[in-house]
Structures are given as C-alpha cells and as structure tokens.
Amino acid sequence: MIALIQRVTQAKVDIAGVTVGAINHGLLVLLGVEKDDNQQKAKRLCEKVCGYRIFSDENDKMNLNVQQAGGSLLVVSQFTLAAETQKGMRPGFSNGAPPEMAENLYHYFVEQCKQQGLETQTGQFAADMQVTLTNDGPVTFWLQV
C-alpha cells in the first residue's frame, strides 16, 4: 500500500464541479492499493501517515505529526500510484488491487484515520476527480508498507 502525502495549507477535491472534500492545514493523502495489500498493511500505513512528523515545531524543525499540528486529512484514492514504470513508455497496472478489494481497503484506511481522532475528508473512490492544493514547503513524501 502506498501513500503519497503532501503537507498543505489547503486542498480540495471536486467531482463534476462540486466540492466533495476539503481541508485547510493538514495532509493531502493520495492512496494507492496494491494486489498484495490487506487490512494489516492499511492500518500500519495509517499509523505511519498520522504519526509522520513533517510539521514544524516552535524551533522550525520537522518534529510534529498532523494531529499535533492541529491539521486534517484529505484522502484521495489514486490507483496510478501502483503503476509499474520501470520498462517501456506506458505504465502497467498489474500490481494494482482489483477494484472491489481496493475500494474496501481504501474505506478501511479512511476509517482507521478517523479512529486516530483526525478530521478526515475524502474524495470518491474511482471517480474522475479534480484535486486542488497548495503544497506547504513544498513537503511531499512517498510512504509504502
């Protein structure tokens, strides 16, 4: 399971011109589910995302996690993160989880984040979405379990 996380000052996701999820200060989490993923991996990745210390403390050092920084999460499914890109000029997606499995694990990941006590907004699984964000820093990390 893969999370591309971006520290943001604002982020929103629109579907057909309608905003379905939005946050101010926090993390935009683009989530990719692979065929070998399971609930245990989803829970571990959630703990890593929620605990990752990439917000500045009073000494301007990356030392606070999203909750300590008073932030929120915007979680958006993105199957393209599971693409194979090593060969050729076209991505392959055989490492991606089947749609039903991916959707179940996506929702499980979101629920785990909510159980961490974080305000968690979402996009819509498998929808054509437009994501708008202001990356703070920019600070972006690729997390994989």
From Swiss-Prot:
Query: Which principal EC class is assigned to this enzyme?
Result: hydrolase
Q: Which HAMAP family match?
A: Deacylase_Dtd (MF_00518)
Q: Which InterPro entries has this protein been placed in?
A: Daa-tRNA_deacyls_DTD, DTD-like_sf
Spell out the family assignment given in the record's similarity comment: Belongs to the DTD family.
Would the keyword tRNA-binding be found if you checked this record's keyword annotation?
A: yes
Catalysed reaction(s) here are: glycyl-tRNA(Ala) + H2O = tRNA(Ala) + glycine + H(+); a D-aminoacyl-tRNA + H2O = a tRNA + a D-alpha-amino acid + H(+)
Q: What is its EC number?
A: 3.1.1.96
Q: Which UniProt keywords apply?
A: Cytoplasm, Hydrolase, RNA-binding, tRNA-binding
Q: What does this protein's UniProt record list under function? A: An aminoacyl-tRNA editing enzyme that deacylates mischarged D-aminoacyl-tRNAs. Also deacylates mischarged glycyl-tRNA(Ala), protecting cells against glycine mischarging by AlaRS. Acts via tRNA-based rather than protein-based catalysis; rejects L-amino acids rather than detecting D-amino acids in the active site. By recycling D-aminoacyl-tRNA to D-amino acids and free tRNA molecules, this enzyme counteracts the toxicity associated with the formation of D-aminoacyl-tRNA entities in vivo and helps enforce protein L-homochirality.
Protein species of origin: Proteus mirabilis (strain HI4320)
The protein depicted here goes by the name D-aminoacyl-tRNA deacylase
**Cited CDD domains:** Dtyr_deacylase
Q: Where in the cell is it found?
A: Cytoplasm
Q: Might you name a Gene Ontology BP term for this protein?
A: D-amino acid catabolic process
- Which domain of life does the UniProt lineage start with? Bacteria
Entry text on domains: A Gly-cisPro motif from one monomer fits into the active site of the other monomer to allow specific chiral rejection of L-amino acids.
Q: Name one GO cellular component term.
A: cytoplasm
Q: Where is this motif: Gly-cisPro motif, important for rejection of L-amino acids?
A: 137-138
Q: Name one Pfam family in it.
A: Tyr_Deacylase
Q: How does it assemble?
A: Homodimer.
Q: Single GO molecular-function term?
A: tRNA binding
